[in-house]
Design a protein with these regions (language model features):
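Conserved short alpha-helical segments that host acidic/polar catalytic motifs at enzyme active sites
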Residues: 1-138, 144-181
């Protein structure tokens, strides 16, 4: 998860009342200008600018820190954005919070090997690292990965709407999406 981009540098590190965390996203937000204006009116600020544009990942992080917990913050993201956003957060305790967008458009895959769990958007990243696919997150599902177990923080919703372009345009050819290649 995350992108290589001149306009959306990732990961970014945030220090907030939730603690320090790093965040990466795969997002397409169509109401970013409205959200930016709303956050600025709440005396929030944006530090990650490139080509005079707001970094989507920073905007997502600012929506997250409006919550009392990471789960509440991620649900705040789902509530406010138009579009989709899947994300990974690396927390201070070394655990990873993985969240799939509420429509299930972009994949989040959990892999496991002895003594470790990992999350990715492309299952093809696992074999060379000796991981096996453990599961695919459902729409809106949130989990927390520790080295020896995974805790579900939010159950998946209904109505998977995976992006069909994965199979044709931008998905990696050797990756599996929802168990299909």
């Amino acid at each position: 998860i995350g992108i290589i981009s001149d306009t959306d540098a990732q990961p970014i590190i945030i220090n907030s009342h939730l603690g320090r965390f790093a965040i990466v996203t795969v997002a397409k937000i169509t109401n970013i200008k409205e959200l930016e204006d709303e956050l600025l009116s709440q005396n929030m600020h944006f530090a990650e600018l490139s080509s005079s544009n707001t970094n989507q990942t920073e905007l997502i992080a600012l929506l997250i820190i409006q919550g009392k917990t990471f789960v509440e913050g991620i649900e705040n993201v789902f509530k406010h954005i138009k579009g989709s956003c899947s994300m990974l957060l690396l927390t201070e305790d070394g655990s990873i919070i993985a969240a799939r967008d509420q429509w299930g458009r972009t994949p989040v895959v959990i892999g496991k090997k002895e003594g470790a769990y990992a999350a990715t958007s492309e299952s093809s990243s696992f074999p060379n690292l000796d991981y096996e696919i453990d599961r695919y997150l459902g729409p809106g599902e949130i989990v927390r990965l520790y080295s020896d177990h995974v805790v579900q923080l939010r159950k998946p919703g209904e109505g998977m709407q995976i992006c069909s372009f994965l199979w044709v345009y931008y998905g990696f050819p050797t990756s599996c999406y929802e168990g299909k290649n």
